[in-house]
Amino acid sequence: MAELQKLSSRLKSVKVTRKITKAMELVAASKIRRAKESFFSNKEYFQIIQDIFDNLASKTEQIFLKKQMKFDKENNTNSILYIVINSDLGLCGAYNSSIAKEIKKEIKSKDKLFLIGKKGLLFLGKFKTQITNLDKVKEISTNYKNIKKISEKILSMFKSGDYKSIKIVYTKYVNAFTYLPTIKHALPILKSEKNINEATFSNLEFEPDPITIFQKAIPLYFSSLLYSCVLESHVSEVSSRRIAMENATKNADELGDQLKIELNTIRQSKITQEITEIVAGSETEI
């Protein structure tokens, strides 16, 4: 009897859990469409900015590319600042752990981390001494104004001369089932290795000159790049959560079916035993 009650209780818990995972799956599915719309529309915009900066870099002397910002002090460090984009919520499969694995492969003791997303503290806790914003980790936001404020703070840190370069660690969206943890170089801007389509910029004039524009427009470039990475990571996160919840729902269904079989087996066994006892009792009376 005790085993029967235990199985019934487990089956009830599985059914409740299944309702939760199914609801979360549907919520994630509804968020994916909006997240994709934001990401792909911004992707077209950022690609234009990227092409313009690639063109600017191709027309700018290499010596300037190394000194494209006015630093507060001479930059002689080899330290790299990694901006790590995680999620605020869990239950999204290997989304956060994959980012953590990627950063652990590359980070050195002299490097620093700037976290965006509360879950970063959980998965990168062993690097506490290297996290620059340990007590002020920002929640992930798909609002450009919020990302712009973060980018301004990071640019200020870069201009202090404490870092040789800045890299962004985010999740690249490939398709609905594939997301790749990626480390992208952000600053200083390097001369593009890809072939510039001169025809696209043949009628483009720079006023006053490429170097001045390059210098003034770096904040726009960096905030746009960071925003693009945040949006792409967000699409990957909600897609990963939908799949995780879909798998959890399937597992709940399978476990529920298994428990039902066990429950029915015990019930049948109990009924058979009772019938046997009744028959045996009747035969004894006869």
From Swiss-Prot:
Topology versus the membrane: Peripheral membrane protein
Pfam families on file: ATP-synt (PF00231)
Alphabetical keyword list: ATP synthesis, Cell membrane, CF(1), Hydrogen ion transport, Ion transport, Membrane, Transport
Top-rank lineage group of the source organism: Bacteria
Molecular functions (GO terms): ATP binding; proton-transporting ATP synthase activity, rotational mechanism
Main location: membrane
GO cellular component terms given for this protein: plasma membrane; proton-transporting ATP synthase complex
GO biological process entries: proton motive force-driven plasma membrane ATP synthesis
InterPro entries per record: ATP_synth_F1_ATPase_gsu, ATP_synth_F1_gsu
Subcellular location: Cell membrane
PANTHER family: ATP SYNTHASE GAMMA CHAIN, ATP SYNTHASE SUBUNIT GAMMA, MITOCHONDRIAL
Record-linked HAMAP family: ATP_synth_gamma_bact
Assembly: F-type ATPases have 2 components, CF(1) - the catalytic core - and CF(0) - the membrane proton channel. CF(1) has five subunits: alpha(3), beta(3), gamma(1), delta(1), epsilon(1). CF(0) has three main subunits: a, b and c.
Family: Belongs to the ATPase gamma chain family.
Function: Produces ATP from ADP in the presence of a proton gradient across the membrane. The gamma chain is believed to be important in regulating ATPase activity and the flow of protons through the CF(0) complex.
The protein's name in its UniProt record: ATP synthase gamma chain
Source organism per UniProt: Mycoplasma mobile (strain ATCC 43663 / 163K / NCTC 11711)
Lineage: Bacteria, Bacillati, Mycoplasmatota, Mycoplasmoidales, Metamycoplasmataceae
Gene field: atpG
